């Protein structure tokens, strides 16, 4: 199921999402003294990252990781790691602990997908709070509808938290949280922007439709997803 939150502009949506995520992190900190946040990459989250980085939280007890990552060097322009380091791990959030998916210092030829997944799994901590995005094809994290590993990514019986995925419609091999790992996250948020993505979301939210991976999140009985939307 999901709860819809709509805002007049992207700045308002980013600030409201930062408020909600900070509240969820504070709840985890109060309950167990620590919290783990997983975020998504791309250009859309930058305003949200900036707002969240200024929140008054006990950041030294917060771990920050990714919902998914491109298997590229962490200094590559397409690296989500680099994006988070630049826009989120700053201001007050600079004190947070980074939980890596891809090892620093590796060249592209040194980054073999299976080894990257093994490395990410060694560092993996189950998130308390997760912020997802959604592509125009309905993918979320790096669970792509036509990827050869799609079934593995959505099959919860194996209890696997991270998988290697190969997008057919996007560049770079990926490492991604699985549907099972997403469903085991206490607080799940989805940020979408623009009429085109809203149209995809509206289609994906109807019934059960594996053509849109986000549908599997929205209809998962273990997930209560808060959707933040602005044109």
UniProtKB/Swiss-Prot annotation:
Chain ranges passing through the membrane: none
Molecular functions per Gene Ontology: 6-phosphogluconolactonase activity
Key words of the record: Hydrolase
Gene3D superfamilies for the chain: 3.40.50.1360
Catalyzed reaction equations: 6-phospho-D-glucono-1,5-lactone + H2O = 6-phospho-D-gluconate + H(+)
PANTHER family: 6-PHOSPHOGLUCONOLACTONASE (PTHR11054:SF0)
Function, in words: Hydrolysis of 6-phosphogluconolactone to 6-phosphogluconate.
Name this polypeptide is given: 6-phosphogluconolactonase
Species: Neisseria meningitidis serogroup B (strain ATCC BAA-335 / MC58)
Highest classification ranks of the organism: Bacteria, Pseudomonadati, Pseudomonadota, Betaproteobacteria, Neisseriales
Gene label: pgl
